[in-house]
A protein has these predicted regions:
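Domain-scale signature associated with acetyltransferase and cell-envelope carbohydrate enzymes
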Residues: 1-113, 137-138, 156, 172, ...
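Contiguous, function-dense segments enriched for cysteine-driven chemistry
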Residues: 116
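A short, glycine- and basic residue-enriched loop/turn
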Residues: 133-134, 151-152, 173
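Glycine-rich NAD(P)-binding loop of Rossmann-like domains
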Residues: 124-136
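Short acidic, glycine/proline-rich loop/turn micro-motifs
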Residues: 62-63, 121-125
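Beta-rich strand-turn-strand
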Residues: 88-96, 144-158, 164-168
Length: 203
């Protein structure tokens, strides 16, 4: 009985945020396990099976995912097999955000492609902020509370540790950590083979 009530509670929350959403260019059919607020004049595209929200995980019942393609030319794109954990938010002010297939975002991640305000105090409200497309490669593991800022490119198979603030690009097969992010060590295909136990022979 309790599990059924919780299912309906979350289902109603998902419907509520869908009704609040104003983005008319959402393509694909993601799996909505948590409420998602789709905002903006741009395009939000889901390729294949994309999972939004994770249970059990923090903020599942009291948070929501925020995805905003703010300007008409903004595009936020998710590859097949991407998992986005609870209370993440992504905002594109034009250049765009791309997340490669098989990548995973931890709880409360932030990805933005713009400063949104000019750094000059005289032009803070009407200046042209710096911006740059964010590209996350395939099979990237991004921990919780990570911030990825404008112009960053993260190579495939890399790992971004919890709480990292990524201000510069990260090569593939790399561990990044800290604020601002530092890189090292680099992984190799041989490292992954050593971490995967060999299958036991069948009798």
């Amino acid at each position: 009985m309790k599990s059924r009530l919780l299912w309906w509670y979350q289902k109603l929350r998902v419907i509520k945020y869908r009704l609040l959403s104003d983005c008319e260019r959402v393509y694909g059919k993601p799996v909505l396990r948590q409420p998602v607020h789709f905002v903006g004049q741009g395009e939000i595209r889901f390729n294949g099976k994309v999972n939004l929200g994770v249970y059990p995980s923090p903020f599942f019942f009291n948070g929501y995912i925020y995805i905003e393609a703010r300007t008409p030319d903004a595009v936020i794109e998710f590859g097949d097999g991407v998992f986005v954990n609870n209370s993440c938010f992504l905002i594109s002010d034009g250049p765009g955000i791309s997340i490669g297939k098989g990548s995973m975002l931890g709880v409360n991640c932030e990805i933005i492609d713009s400063d949104f305000h000019d750094t000059n105090p005289q032009r803070r409200l009407n200046g042209v902020p710096r911006s740059g497309k964010v590209v996350i490669g395939e099979n990237v593991l991004i921990g919780s509370n990570v911030k990825i800022l404008k112009g960053v490119r993260i190579g495939k198979d890399s790992i971004i540790a919890n709480g990292t603030v990524v201000t510069k690009s990260v090569p593939e097969n790399m561990l990044a950590f800290g604020n601002p992010a530092k890189c090292g060590p680099r992984f190799s295909p041989q490292d992954w083979k050593q971490r995967v136990p060999a299958a036991e022979p069948q009798p």
